Every structure is written in structure tokens, then in C-alpha cells.
């Protein structure tokens, strides 16, 4: 069944937006604790290469191999995030400088590229990859078929994660505590909340989400390893958190919007529809988002206007009692 351009773009936008959504949810949790993580892009690339390496090396069933790959990607992302957490929480280094340094260290010209070459992963298709969960008969349904039933399991898990993160931040004691840590760490400390522990935990969880986001590229969207495969998606994810006003449900909307933009250009080309240099604009989007992010996070007045956590990007020094 041939679907309309709009349906195909939306369905592809959901798929392409899924890694953005995972990365944005992880960044949101870290920022809610007051930690700005500009190393998302590097963590995504480490997750991408380690997830792909795992699925190539684990000789098991498809489900077991993919589950192991996602687990390894999450751990790899969390380990890179641990470096960031140690630098900015324990050593109180600049969160902007640390994040940028980690992106360079682990990014397309750094550790992820070295690992990809050392493991000889380039130009090898994935032994296993995520496919659509529902049968093709469901996917042929008008409109909802490709959009809802034509997705892989990572898409459906991401929906559950949006609900879980939203409920966690608004309906649970630890979630309310982390919001207190991000808004007023001194007051949270006075109430007996361990500020450092909350910041460490949520930074590591954010890194794990970024690792899964990276593995989504190599195991679902483009089942192979290519240097810089994320293409600046980490920067878009950081911008998403800001534009979503630190709300998980709006991160979902924004992720799918940017995913649809990414899907639009190839679909237009496939249908021989020319609307100007859309590909050039799409390729420049990550760099534009980098500029936007750095401008927004550098101005305290802008952060307050957007509703950012009051202590975002600020180290906490506990007063002697």
C-alpha cells in the first residue's frame, strides 16, 4: 500500500526522532539535578560503537544479542558520564568546558573513531537489528499503520520512558528531591538531601540514556558503524530540552518534529519534489543548534526566562556547619 508523503514523513520522523528522545530524556534528568551535560554527542557515539560491537561479537539469539547490545551501550554511556560527573561535581570544574571536552574526546575524531577502527567495524552490516514489532498486515492500515504499528521495540520503550520520567519527576519523592537539588541545592542540603549523590545518579542515568540513543542509530536506523554516525544529534537533543521547557512530554513532540525534518529531505528527493536546498539546511541543523545551545546556557537571564532549574550549571559548595 502506498502511503501519502505526510504519513511516510511522520512515520519516519518517529523512527528518526527516537534517539533524540532518549538523549533528551537523559539530558533532562541531568539538568533537573543542576548538571549541564554538553557531552551528550560523545556519549551517544560511544554507545553507538559499543552497542554495534556487542551485537557483532555476542553469538546468541537475536533478542539476546540486541538486549546485550543495548545494555552495553547504556553502561558505556554511563561510564563516560561518570567522568563528567567527577569533574563537575567533585572537582567543581566548568560544566560547559567539561562537556565540550568529553564530546571532543569521545566524539567522531576521538575514542569512538579509534574503537570503530580497532574493532574493524566499518563496512560490516549488523548481524542483528531491530525490526518492526507488528506484522505487515497491521502496517498496511491507513495512517496509523506505518506511524504506530511500523515501529521497532525501542520506539515503544521510549514512550514508556516518557511516561516514567514524567511521573518520576512529579509524583515520587526522589523526583521531587532532584528538582529541589536543581533549583536550590543549599535548601535541599538543609533538608537532609544528599546533593552530590543525586547529581551523580542523574548524570549517570543521563549518560546511560545517551548510550542507548547512540545504539539506536547503529542497531535500528542505520544498522552499521560509520564514524560520526549520530551527525550532531546530541546537540539537537540538548536544544530539545531547552525548547521543551524541561518537560518530558514536550521532548517527545520536539524529537518527532526534528525527526520529521530529517526524514523530509530524502522523501522529497525520492518523489522528485524539489523545494530548494532542504538537504543543506538539514545538514546544517546540528551546527545551528550548537550555537543556540551555547547562547542560551551562557546567559543566566535567558535560563531564568525559559524556566531552567535555578542552579543549572552551577557547582555546589557545601557550607561548613
Where are these regions (language model features)?
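Membrane-interfacial amphipathic/re-entrant helices at transmembrane-helix boundaries
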Residues: 1-24, 36, 50, 57-69
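Hydrophobic alpha-helical segments embedded in the membrane of multi-pass proteins
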Residues: 17-26, 42-47, 78-82, 182, ...
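Short, non-helical or kinked segments that cap or interrupt transmembrane helices
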Residues: 28-47, 67, 89-102, 177, ...
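Alpha-helical transmembrane segments within multi-pass membrane transporters and channels
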Residues: 62-109, 257, 262
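Transmembrane helix-bundle core of multi-pass membrane transporters
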Residues: 106-171, 271-282, 306-321
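Helix-loop-helix "hairpin" substructures at the membrane interface of multi-pass membrane proteins
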Residues: 147-225, 248-249, 253
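Cytosolic-side transmembrane-helix boundaries in multi-pass membrane proteins
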Residues: 183-190, 194-197, 268-321
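Transmembrane alpha-helical segments in multi-pass inner-membrane proteins
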Residues: 220-287
Amino acid at each position: 500500500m502506498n502511503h501519502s508523503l505526510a504519513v511516510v514523513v511522520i512515520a519516519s520522523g518517529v523512527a528518526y526522532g527516537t534517539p533524540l528522545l532518549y538523549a533528551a530524556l537523559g539530558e533532562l534528568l541531568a539538568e533537573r539535578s543542576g548538571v549541564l551535560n554538553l557531552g551528550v554527542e560523545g556519549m551517544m557515539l560511544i554507545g553507538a560503537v559499543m552497542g554495534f560491537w556487542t551485537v557483532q561479537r555476542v553469538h546468541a539469539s537475536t533478542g539476546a544479542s540486541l538486549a546485550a547490545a543495548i545494555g552495553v551501550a547504556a553502561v558505556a554511556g554511563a561510564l563516560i558520564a561518570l567522568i563528567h560527573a567527577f569533574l563537575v561535581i567533585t572537582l567543581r570544574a566548568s560544566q560547559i568546558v567539561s562537556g565540550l571536552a568529553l564530546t571532543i574526546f569521545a566524539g567522531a575524531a576521538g575514542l569512538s573513531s579509534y574503537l570503530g577502527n580497532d574493532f574493524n567495524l566499518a563496512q560490516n552490516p549488523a548481524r542483528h537489528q531491530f525490526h518492526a514489532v507488528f506484522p505487515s498486515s497491521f502496517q498496511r492500515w491507513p495512517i496509523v499503520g506505518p506511524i504506530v504499528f511500523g515501529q521497532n521495540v525501542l520506539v515503544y520503550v521510549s514512550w514508556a520512558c516518557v511516561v516514567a520520567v514524567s511521573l518520576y519527576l512529579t509524583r515520587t519523592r526522589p523526583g521531587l528531591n532532584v528538582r529541589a537539588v536543581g533549583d536550590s541545592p543549599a535548601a535541599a542540603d538543609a533538608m537532609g538531601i544528599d546533593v552530590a549523590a543525586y547529581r551523580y545518579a542523574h548524570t549517570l542515568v543521563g549518560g546511560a540514556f545517551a548510550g542507548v540513543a547512540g545504539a539506536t542509530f547503529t542497531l535500528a536506523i542505520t544498522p552499521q558503524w560509520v564514524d560520526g554516525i549520530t551527525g550532531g544529534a546530541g546537540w539537537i537533543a540538548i536544544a530539545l530540552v531547552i525548547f521543551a521547557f524541561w518537560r518530558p512530554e514536550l521532548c517527545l513532540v520536539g524529537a518527532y518534529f526534528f525527526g520529521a525534518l530529517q526524514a523530509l529531505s530524502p522523501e522529497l528527493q525520492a518523489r522528485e519534489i524539489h523545494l530548494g536546498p532542504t538537504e543543506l539546511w538539514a545538514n546544517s541543523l546540528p551546527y545551528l543548534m550548537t550555537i543556540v545551545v551555547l547562547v542560551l546556557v551562557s546567559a543566566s537571564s535567558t535560563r531564568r526566562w525559559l524556566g531552567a532549574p535555578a542552579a543549572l550549571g552551577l557547582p555546589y559548595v557545601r557550607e561548613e556547619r
